[in-house]
């Protein structure tokens, strides 16, 4: 079971948080059959819509976060029926902050705020892409504790659509976002399937790597 790692003496530094993220995140060569691109990088600061979602849900301010690092991006397949995967590691000041954020994010209010955020994001994207393929209706399903033996894990499964000018559905985009917490960190795996979902075997392989590294390292 992934539990709470004992904190190091004194506050966690940015350097410690980044080093932990680097030790846990997926890296080149981890996923056979996938090609990796770009280097691990610090995630951009949340935009206006994302900040509005956090305020709506009563979530923890991202200003309190010590570091959020995104892994290299893995891709496989053609443009249609392609697959994309990446991991993200967030480090916060204490396990209590992570626990509070995790509890709030699973409340019905937070789920409603997330749906509102996605709708607003899609509307803005469609305006920017006028005349090109539009984002259509979507569905969201949440699965609590999807990882056996792992406390405080979650899965958010999003099924998006892409529309032709006629309004007919051209493609489905399947986006699975897995997450779990350990000590002052939250680890996520995002798996995007174009045309069909990313195989569960590929998701399981990536998740096992992240779990093993999270248990083998401490902030």
Annotate each predicted stretch with a short phrase.
Residues 37-170:
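A small/polar (G/S/T-enriched), proline-flanked helix-loop surface module common
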Residues 136-219:
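A short, solvent-exposed beta-edge/loop patch
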Residues 23, 79, 89, 105-106, ...:
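Extracytoplasmic/periplasmic, Sec-exported soluble proteins
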Residues 2-80, 206-219:
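Extracytoplasmic low-complexity, Pro/Thr/Ser/Ala/Gly-rich segments
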Residues 18, 22, 101, 111, ...:
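Generic detector of well-ordered alpha-helical segments enriched in charged/polar residues
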Residues 13, 27, 94-95, 199:
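Helix N-cap and loop-to-helix transition residues
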């Amino acid at each position: 079971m992934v539990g709470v790692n004992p904190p190091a003496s004194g506050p966690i530094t940015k350097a410690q948080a980044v080093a932990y993220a680097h030790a846990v995140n997926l890296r080149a060569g981890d996923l056979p059959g996938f090609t990796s691109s770009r280097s691990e990088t610090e995630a951009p600061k949340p935009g206006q819509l994302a900040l509005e979602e956090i305020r709506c849900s009563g979530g923890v301010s991202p200003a309190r976060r010590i570091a959020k690092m995104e892994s290299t991006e893995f891709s496989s397949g053609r443009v249609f029926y392609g697959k994309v995967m990446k991991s993200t590691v967030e480090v916060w000041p204490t396990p209590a902050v992570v626990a509070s954020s995790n509890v709030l994010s699973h409340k019905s209010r937070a789920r409603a705020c997330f749906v509102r955020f996605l709708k607003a994001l899609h509307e803005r994207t469609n305006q920017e892409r006028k005349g090109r393929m539009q984002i259509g209706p979507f569905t969201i399903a949440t699965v609590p504790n999807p990882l056996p033996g792992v406390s405080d894990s979650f899965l958010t499964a999003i099924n998006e659509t892409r529309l032709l000018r006629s309004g007919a559905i051209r493609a489905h985009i399947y986006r699975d976002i897995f997450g779990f917490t350990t000590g002052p960190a939250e680890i996520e795996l995002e798996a995007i399937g174009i045309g069909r979902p990313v195989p569960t075997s590929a998701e399981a392989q990536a998740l096992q790597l992240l779990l093993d590294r999270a248990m083998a390292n401490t902030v």
